[in-house]
């Protein structure tokens, strides 16, 4: 694996190590394991692809699983994200800056995010969840609904892992009720609760934020 160092501060600093060389044998073992996924399973593809692997690794994985009923979540940026859209990922989660970079625009408000999130949906994404830090979040759902919410009230302590927590919270909420609004609120609650705590949030902390945003 590799060692990543996160310096916890308001601005946040990350010192990320270079990933290891992954031999072809290990890549084949991974693909064999992933091929066993099926109906009802959820697969998260997040971050950059190791330099020793083909840059179309995500596409190959999604192509292999196409039609098997696996819900695939992709948390990646720019070209890596755009290349997987034809494979219809269940969820993608760019932030407003990443979304703006794709289209060459600056997106500062929730309202401005919506048309660009819809463009990603037209290109193949089923659900587009856009995080906006202090501005809140937007969900353009597969149902055709659009949900917006301001950021919950709380003191920002540690932003490390907040985005990952948001994605996990959304999927946990969706798997619980298969309701997009509930999933959206769970995503916001999990991401915000983690940002409000020294470490990843507890179930109780997430529940407290969820209650705040659903009153």
Spans of model-derived segments:
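A general structural signal for well-ordered alpha-helical segments in protein cores
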Residues: 2, 27, 58, 96-99, ...
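Short, charged, surface-exposed secondary-structure boundary motifs
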Residues: 25, 101-107, 156-160
């Amino acid at each position: 694996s590799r060692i990543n160092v996160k310096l916890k501060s308001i601005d946040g600093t990350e010192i990320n190590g270079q990933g290891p060389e992954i031999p072809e044998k290990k890549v084949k073992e991974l693909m064999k394991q992933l091929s066993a996924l099926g109906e009802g399973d959820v697969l998260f593809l997040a971050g950059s692809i190791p330099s020793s692997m083909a840059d179309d690794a995500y596409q190959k994985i999604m192509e292999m699983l196409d039609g098997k009923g696996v819900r695939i979540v992709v948390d990646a940026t720019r070209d890596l994200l755009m290349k997987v859209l034809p494979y219809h990922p269940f969820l993608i989660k760019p932030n407003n800056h990443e979304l703006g970079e794709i289209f060459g625009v600056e997106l500062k408000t929730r309202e401005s995010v919506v048309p660009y999130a819809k463009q990603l949906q037209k290109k193949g994404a089923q659900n587009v969840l856009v995080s906006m830090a202090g501005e809140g979040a937007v969900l353009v759902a597969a149902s055709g609904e659009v949900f917006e919410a301001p950021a919950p009230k709380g003191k920002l302590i540690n932003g490390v892992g907040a985005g990952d927590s948001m994605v996990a919270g959304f999927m946990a909420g969706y798997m619980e009720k298969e309701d997009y609004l509930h999933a959206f609120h769970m995503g916001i609650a999990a991401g915000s609760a983690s940002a409000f705590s020294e470490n990843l949030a507890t179930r109780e902390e997430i529940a407290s934020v969820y209650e705040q945003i659903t009153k």
